[in-house]
Amino acid sequence: MSIKPPSISLLPVSPEQLVRLQSEIGDFSPTQLAWLSGYFWGMVNQQPQVQAVVPAVPAQETITLISASQTGNARRLAEQLREDLLAQKLNVNLFNAGDYKFKQIAQEKILIIIASTQGEGEPAEEAVALYKYLYSKKVPKLNDTVFAVFGLGDTSYERFCQAGKDFDNRLNELGAQRLLERVDGDVEYQQVADQWRKQLTGILKQRIPTETGTEITSAQDRSVNEVFSTSYTKQAPLTAALATCQKITGRGSDKDVRHIEIDLGDSGLRYQPGDALGVWFENDPELVDEVLNLLWLQGTEQVEVNGQKLSLREALISHVELTQNTSVIVEKYAVLAKDEKLLSLIADKQALQQYAHNKPIADMIREAASQPEAQQFIDLLRPLTPRLYSISSSQAEMENEVHLTVGVVRYEIDGRARTGGASGYLADRLQENSDIRIFIEHNDNFRLPADPRTPVIMIGPGTGIAPFRAFMQQREADGAEGKNWLFFGNPHFTEDFLYQVEWQRYVKDGLLTRIDLAWSRDQQHKIYVQDKLREQGEAVWCWIKEGAHLYVCGDANRMAKDVEHALLDIIAEHGGMDTEQADEFLSELRFERRYQRDVY
């Protein structure tokens, strides 16, 4: 049903909150809406934002807890810690890093940061503004602050947990005192996180005495996502059906990009443009057989994974990573195999990291043969983790479907074809109507403007175009009046113009106001989206002055950095600013949610 909102000035909610709410209840019946109104009224009256016991003694110190999350893990851990602290009758306010007013940091007495790392050791996207502020000349001394940091990362990357390390070091440099040493968590972090939570809660309970009658407060920042969340999660995914897997690059393309449609049926799974889809996958049985043969194992041996007993073959297919090597795995395997070449790498961290990056697990075993026990080998490997893909559809148009735009990872090692774990699973091994286990990873840091009249600039080369297809479907469904400008790039026009017909229709219909295309291999000199941005610098600056929101999606290591440099150059040149002023201006756009990135 369609609901016409009253004047924003009369509402106790922001325009952004109203739009998010409307997107969630758009298909609710009048009966359901009436029930919801009573539900929310009851929630407000039964669960007030400040839970009070009879106030008596002076208010205790409040703990400020900041989650800097990239894929939701830091946020979930922060919520677990908040519950621990509340159970001990401690005051705690939980903030997403993007919502934290960082200039109030000088007033913080107890500061806890849980920080994910993305790309090449960079902070999570929502934490960039806070990170830059802490390293700026404006940041005050924090001599009256105590703090603790938990870092989340992945040992397959060279700068493991670098963002957590940076936050920890910088707070200490500013005069803050550690409550306990920083802890770094790998992909399978829950056990060390549980220990850290228990230790930190004990320290804080001793530091902050509580008495009967103390008023206990907690920021209740329930989002629309939480209110309307379904029962499907990473741990309990939805089993949906693969409806379509269609190659959308040409025969002559060096890239294999798939348009994937998944049927949600009557599951009730909900998502918004900007969200990601988590996909659980299985390893290629042929790869599993190759590994078993190289190790002289049968696959029928019994092993234990997370307390569950199963065959080695089943464990290798469904429970552990086989396509992502890490320096930790190389080091452990070197000791197990007693291989001199691998053992020599251990002393050279950079060489070890490079070897792990370039040599898949199967090829490492081929180079350094060994005959371990089945359980020994399983214990070397990391648990299988789902892959996240930017959603390329809007439920306003696709209803009970979710679409993905997936680049299939294909390469060769010494003449042997290798394929990405999840992308190969989707493209090569699943058939139409096959079951696929999925869940939604909400991303409130990549959302369309609340005001449909706001201009939008979308920058997404390659499969980075995915969320912008969802954006345009949503803007069309909403009848949004705001202008839309797309910057897209790929190697060749004839082979790699993803969703060409759809973009041409949007241009023809007037929904897509402008489109700039960068084909890097169609001429002698390479042209990328950042070059097109600079070429249109004056117009881009005009749109920014008109209030445009900027969105970037795609490769974090090169493209996103090059695009940011181009934006800084545009702001400096056309805004009449020096380098420092341009950087502050872009940081302000980020803080205002006018510059958002979904990079990986």
Swiss-Prot record:
FAD binds at residues 323, 357, 387-390, 405-407, 411, 420-423, 600. SUPFAM superfamilies: Ferredoxin reductase-like, C-terminal NADP-linked domain, Flavoproteins, Riboflavin synthase domain-like. GO terms for cellular component: cytosol. Transmembrane segments: none annotated. Its cofactor is FAD; FMN. CDD domains: SiR. NADP(+) binds at residues 520-521, 526-530, 562. FMN binds at residues 69-74, 116-119, 152-161. This is Sulfite reductase [NADPH] flavoprotein alpha-component. It comes from Photorhabdus laumondii subsp. laumondii (strain DSM 15139 / CIP 105565 / TT01) (Photorhabdus luminescens subsp. laumondii).
